[in-house]
């Protein structure tokens, strides 16, 4: 089966590579000529465990190709996936200009039936706009060519995307015709054979499902952070509370971890977009507005704990603060909306010297903020002469540090754990002053 995927960002490249690995012939398209040149030279522009090897494997097998020219591949494909960016506008709504540009290009060059599938996260009603954009171009050409639009939102977790794609909890597909359903069933046949759930529904429901799923997960995070902050005030332990409520099968144990706020390319953007969609339709999403407020506040919690430990914000001036973790989560270099960016600004504004280490995201941080902080060679280098250590990202290598070595390296034995990964008793035995979230 021949398919095209427009957009070689995170979603497009992972999806295209994984489809190729199931046996499809995939052409990935991007208007960025430099990115396509890099891909054709075997350079992967994003970090995702296992992706480099999988791209090389499928390129070598002849199932995965890269080009800048969408028009040149339309005659040969049955499906065109649109996986381009939908950045938020200033008002929080999703900007569809790239999605609609793809539709326009398809309309300008279409010669036979295809299914045009939106994989980007888009508001309800986008498929109608895609259909109209294609029809407008066909009308300008004076031709009538049958096509279908569909929605197939992605549910990939950065750092675990290949496994998520190849072994999904579910595949959601929104279609408007039996023909489109038949074509997409053929594409997803390898998943059906392996008994993975492919759920077909109408297009508006598929578009809503992605926003609803991410907003539900964001809600669980903010709820637990709210509970954690209350636990600190009443003498409860949020870890015990999590165990107590997570054992209820109606609630479950996942996404019940307190911390220093969520970030990334999805949750913040999707919550804002769903709030905006509701506003545009005369409804106010009060729960999600609270979720957003709680998260923004939570990103400052570690700084507030640091100020409290030193007595005042003025007392932070000239202090050296070690930071472990820069990416918004482990196994990625993505720093979009990361708590680390908020923390760095607050620390620098307070006159602190920041020494940071992250296994993957150092280059990305330098690209974003330059040399305003010190980038350290490892986790132990970061704590050298530090007055405090802040843990922001729960990378595996941070979970069992040598506290004896760290204590000797630091000026003050102060640890503030933003992800609750350290053992309280172990730190107390090593005579550290330890603060975490929710106890």
Name what the model sees in each region.
Residues 1-439:
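Structural/interface elements that position substrates and couple domains in central-metabolism enzymes
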């Amino acid at each position: 089966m021949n398919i095209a995927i427009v957009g070689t960002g995170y979603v497009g490249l992972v999806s295209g590579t994984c489809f190729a690995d199931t046996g499809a012939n995939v052409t990935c398209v991007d208007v960025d000529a430099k990115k396509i040149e890099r891909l054709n030279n075997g350079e992967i522009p994003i970090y995702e465990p296992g992706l480099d090897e999988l791209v090389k494997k499928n390129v070598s097998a002849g199932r995965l190709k890269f080009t800048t020219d969408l028009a040149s591949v339309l005659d040969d494909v049955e499906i065109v996936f649109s996986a381009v960016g939908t950045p938020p506008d200033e008002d929080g709504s999703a900007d569809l200009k790239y999605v609609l540009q793809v539709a326009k290009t398809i309309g300008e060059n279409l010669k036979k039936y295809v299914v045009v599938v939106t994989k980007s996260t888009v508001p309800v009603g986008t498929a109608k706009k895609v259909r109209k954009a294609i029809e407008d171009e066909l009308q300008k050409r004076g031709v009538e060519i049958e096509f279908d639009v569909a929605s197939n939102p992605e549910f990939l977790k950065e750092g675990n995307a290949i496994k998520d794609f190849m072994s999904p909890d579910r595949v959601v597909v929104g279609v408007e015709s039996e023909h489109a359903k038949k074509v997409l069933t053929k594409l997803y046949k390898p998943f059906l054979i392996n008994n993975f759930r492919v759920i077909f529904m109408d297009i508006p429901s598929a578009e809503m499902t992605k926003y609803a799923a991410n907003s539900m997960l964001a809600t669980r995070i903010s709820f637990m952070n709210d509970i954690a902050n209350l636990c600190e005030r009443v003498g409860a332990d949020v870890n015990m509370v999590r165990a107590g409520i997570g054992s209820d099968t109606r609630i479950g144990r996942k996404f019940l971890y307190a911390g220093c706020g969520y970030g990334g390319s999805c949750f913040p953007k999707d919550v804002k977009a769903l709030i905006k969609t509701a506003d545009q339709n005369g409804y106010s999403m009060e729960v999600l507005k609270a979720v957003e407020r709680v998260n923004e506040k939570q990103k400052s919690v570690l700084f507030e704990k640091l100020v409290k430990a030193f007595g005042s914000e003025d007392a932070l001036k000239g202090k050296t603060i070690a930071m472990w973790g820069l990416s918004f989560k482990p196994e990625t270099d993505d720093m979009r909306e990361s708590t680390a960016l908020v923390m760095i600004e607050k620390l620098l504004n307070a006159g602190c010297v920041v020494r940071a280490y992250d296994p993957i995201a150092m280059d990305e941080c330098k690209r974003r903020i330059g040399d305003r902080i010190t980038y350290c060679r490892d986790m132990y280098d970061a704590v050298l002469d530090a007055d405090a250590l802040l843990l922001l990202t729960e990378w595996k290598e941070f979970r069992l540090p040598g506290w004896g070595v760290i204590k000797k390296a630091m000026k003050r034995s102060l640890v503030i754990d933003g992800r609750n990964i350290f053992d309280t008793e172990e730190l107390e035995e090593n005579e550290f002053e330890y603060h975490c979230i929710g106890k």
